[in-house]
Amino acid sequence: AHLIAPTHRLLDAASDQAKGKAKIGSTLKGIGPTYMDKTGRNGLRVGDLTSGKFEERYQALRTKHLGLLAQYSDFEYDLESVESEWLSAAKELGQLQLIDTEHFLNEALDAGKRVLAEGAQGPMLDIDFGTYPFVTSSNTIAAGACNGLGVGPGRIGEVIGIFKAYCTRVGSGPFPTELLDETGE
């Protein structure tokens, strides 16, 4: 699992602010910038917490992010106000028992145990099948669980879809059932 650093959240906010009226309505949790580092193969992972090189990797990522933030001249931020608390939490997280969930889950399935996976969001927010660019950074469809958990698709026995009686959306983007008249108010 990848870690969302304080600078990821700052990059998310800076990018959103710079887009002005064209912004897509990010949740500002740093998820998009974290996925950018994941696909760029320079992100921080939970396993890095116990690697002995966490501080070095964090500082390299921090330096990269500060360089990117410098491009947003109108964006003001205070990294130090959240960084020490985040580093403390990261240290505490690194002291927990960390396991390889891919092996753990597959061993459980091999032993005949039932595994329940829960996902969030819906197909219209899926990075590949959703209303791009107004999507999240991950696969939100049932197949995304296989990728995220390290479980082969042939191991899934049953998928149960749950939906709300009414649609909602965070941010902007297409909303086919939105009522723009008095009823929608």
Placement of each model-derived feature along the sequence:
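Non-transmembrane, aqueous-exposed alpha-helical and coiled segments at domain scale
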Residues: 1-185
